[in-house]
Amino acid sequence: MPRWEEKNLIEEGKKLGYQVATIYSKDFVLFSNDFTIDNDTDLFIQRNVSHNRALITSFLVEQVGYPVINDHTTLIRCENKIFTTYILARHNIPTPKTFIAFDKTNAIEYSKKLGYPVVIKPVEGSWGRMVAKADNLDVLYSYLEYQEFSTQKYKDIYYIQEFVNKPNRDIRIFVIGDETPVGIYRVNENNWRTNTALGAKAYPLKIDEELRELALKVKDIIGGFFLGIDIFEDKDRGYLVDEVNGVPEYKNTVRVNNFNVSKFLLEKAAEWVKK
């Protein structure tokens, strides 16, 4: 079922005079020896909730020769937290201290070196699901054991991060093309996780020059056209880039900022296609 964002994109596209069509993954078929799509389309905008479907459909559309927002390479870099963190860190983007381990012994040893509490995250996932904070060894061991016997695709790879003692909020900035038109604070008074899916409230954000430059640097490194960038505030180190979303939701951003993200995205995408 389309979310608010997809419905709004269709509505705003029609207002702008564009011909807008919705293609559902379940109806999408492409033969390997017939690289054609029976569709008079200038641009595809990827809005799959499922990462696997988003990745594969973007890839297939690209093979036919259509531009797509976002391309499959960007989606890989965004969805896989290992790719995101290590690509950004290699390019000197400030990120939370993170390590990857491939067995529990190393995960435990290096968590001690990192210092408790630590945060355990699934390699892929969104909305704060299965993200846990371990305050000590006993709690960490329980989470590692749970992951080991779970059905996660990367259950034998441990992504462990420092716990950033941020305010009870984080920052979400949207990059569209080469601009940072809007952002929000996500504030959670009842949970250290600041995802709106877990009860965080959205508030308007005034994007300063430092934030704008940081977000655009991330976009240049990760790629893509439309990104949602999650940033922590650390009292000593300043801004830390935590995650990047390649198919971002923005309903709450529109609501609190009174900013038409769909219209802005469509207009900028139309300019991009014409170049």
Curated annotation (Swiss-Prot):
Induction remarks: Activated by LysM and repressed by lysine.
Domain of life: Archaea
Note on cofactor: Binds 2 magnesium ions per subunit.
GO molecular function, one term: coenzyme F420-2 alpha-glutamyl ligase activity
EC number assigned by the record: 6.3.2.43
Residues the entry annotates as binding Mg(2+) 1: 230, 243
Metal-binding recorded as keyword: yes
InterPro entries, alphabetized: ATP-grasp (IPR011761), ATP-grasp_RimK-type (IPR013651), ATP_grasp_subdomain_1 (IPR013815), LysX/ArgX_preATP_grasp (IPR054562), LysX_arch (IPR011870), PreATP-grasp_dom_sf (IPR016185), Rp_bS6_RimK/Lys_biosynth_LsyX (IPR004666)
Listed cofactors: Mg(2+)
Function per UniProt: Catalyzes the ATP-dependent formation of a covalent bond between the amino group of alpha-aminoadipate (AAA) and the gamma-carboxyl group of the C-terminal glutamate residue in LysW.
Protein name per Swiss-Prot or TrEMBL: Alpha-aminoadipate--LysW ligase LysX
Natural source organism: Saccharolobus solfataricus (strain ATCC 35092 / DSM 1617 / JCM 11322 / P2)
Higher taxonomy: Archaea, Thermoproteota, Thermoprotei, Sulfolobales, Sulfolobaceae
